[in-house]
Amino acid sequence: AGMRLGFAVANPELINSVFTVKNSFNHFPVDFLAQTAGKAACKNYSYYEENAKKIVNERILLTEFLRSKNWFVIESKTNFIFAKKDGMSGTSIYEAVKKEGILIRHFNTPGIEDFVRITIGTKEQMDKLKKVLVEI
């Protein structure tokens, strides 16, 4: 998450509107390293496509696992899931996995304070997380 590079696809009118106001909130700096990484990524599409498939697969497996353990999981099409376990606070889940060296996100925002956001990692990382979640 140290370097981010993105792109937008939109109606030309909308893109022009974004460029009209961009300097008032963000000038979209893209340094040389990000540009170089972006070029390399475009040249190796199959690598990223394969990684995306792995992330989707691990997300599905984690969602199914959590639901089988009576967690409420919001449907996701991203590289993370948003979930909660009845009877457990988001803080207690966060602290329990943190003790095992696993970092997830917890928000103290009213309405979502019992949810955690879990970023999908490698199979090994997700297996470790599942093991920890069963124990709490």
Question: What would you call each of these model-derived segments?
Answer:
Residues 25, 80, 111:
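Residue-level detector of flexible, active-site-proximal loop/helix-junction positions
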Residues 17, 37, 84, 92, ...:
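Phosphate- and divalent-cation-binding pockets in alpha/beta enzyme and binding domains
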Residues 9, 82-84, 119-121:
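Short hydrophobic/aromatic beta-strand micro-patches
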Residues 96-100, 104-105, 109-136:
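PLP-dependent enzyme catalytic core of the Aspartate aminotransferase-like
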Residues 2, 77, 111-114:
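Short acidic/glycine-enriched loop/turn segments that link adjacent beta-strands
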Residues 55-56, 60, 64-100, 116:
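Conserved PLP-binding catalytic core of the aspartate aminotransferase-like
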Residues 3, 83-84, 104-106:
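Thr-Gly-centered strand-to-loop micro-motif
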Residues 1-66, 71-74:
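PLP-dependent aminotransferase class I/II
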